[in-house]
């Protein structure tokens, strides 16, 4: 037996979204933008290792398999792996919800599943942070999967400097939970200056979300990271034709001061 295995970009990093808080190597779309912005000087796709993996897979009876990204529903080989799994395997999938899930449903309709659909808050928040996303389409695909798997389908978020006070709005739209705080880059909660932090905390106090309140109360402001984040945002706003202040006007003083 192999208790669990995770396919984290083992089939490449193909992805159709450029999420702000992503990182080099995890998303082909993010890499493409970073290359255009001269943040990286080369752009190579992450190679697929599926051939060897599928051969090795035959040696094990896997109890739990997790498919992450890139965007797992864009990677054909993921479905090849799924089709070889025993129906007793719990299959976990993290998807951005933009890809038609019909093939996923056909492949896994008889499996035990846990489907996490990534979003960052309501429509405008998700579409800004997860650039390229269409929240209406995401909701359509979410509902398609929920009709098959019920409460095994849920929204999940990252908890970052931009969205923390908007996450509870997602809870009113569909079944959802707040995921884990961003810790690997400057979109962490430490990039929130004290005045905006107080504003966000007041909003969360009114809602009463204890977990989000604790995360934010424990965050120590790092001004250097805040400016790094805003420069990162400004470069992408110019490239994409977007504007942070259309969705997060509370950042106006800092955004307009930032030389990105």
Residues covered by each model-derived region:
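Leucine-rich repeat
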Residues: 49-54, 78-80, 103-104
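N-terminal pre-core extensions flanking Radical SAM catalytic domains
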Residues: 1-42, 58-59, 213-260
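Residues at alpha-helix caps and immediate loop-helix transition turns in enzyme cores, especially N-
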Residues: 77-78, 104, 134, 166-170
């Amino acid at each position: 037996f192999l208790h669990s295995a995770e396919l984290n970009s083992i089939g490449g990093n193909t992805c159709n979204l450029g999420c702000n808080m992503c990182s080099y190597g995890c998303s082909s779309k993010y890499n493409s933008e970073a290359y255009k912005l001269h943040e990286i000087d080369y752009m190579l796709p992450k190679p697929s290792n599926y051939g060897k993996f599928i051969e090795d897979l035959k040696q094990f009876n896997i109890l739990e398999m997790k498919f992450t990204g890139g965007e797992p529903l864009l990677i054909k080989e993921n479905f090849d792996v799924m089709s070889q799994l025993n129906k007793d395997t719990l299959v976990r999938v993290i998807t951005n919800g933009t890809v038609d899930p019909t093939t996923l449903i056909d492949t896994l309709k008889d499996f035990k599943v846990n489907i996490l659909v990534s979003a960052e808050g309501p429509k405008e928040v998700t579409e800004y942070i997860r650039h390229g996303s269409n929240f209406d389409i995401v909701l359509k695909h979410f509902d398609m999967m929920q009709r098959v798997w019920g409460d095994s389908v849920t929204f999940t978020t990252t908890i970052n400097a931009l969205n923390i006070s908007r996450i509870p709005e997602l809870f009113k739209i569909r079944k959802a939970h707040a995921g884990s705080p961003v810790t690997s880059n400057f979109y962490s909660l430490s990039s929130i200056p004290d005045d905006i932090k107080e504003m966000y905390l007041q909003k969360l106090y009114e809602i009463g979300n204890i977990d989000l309140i604790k995360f934010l109360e424990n965050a120590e402001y790092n001004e250097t990271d805040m400016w790094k984040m805003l420069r990162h945002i400004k470069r992408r706003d110019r490239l994409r034709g977007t504007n942070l202040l259309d969705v997060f006007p509370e950042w106006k003083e800092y955004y307009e001061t930032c030389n990105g």
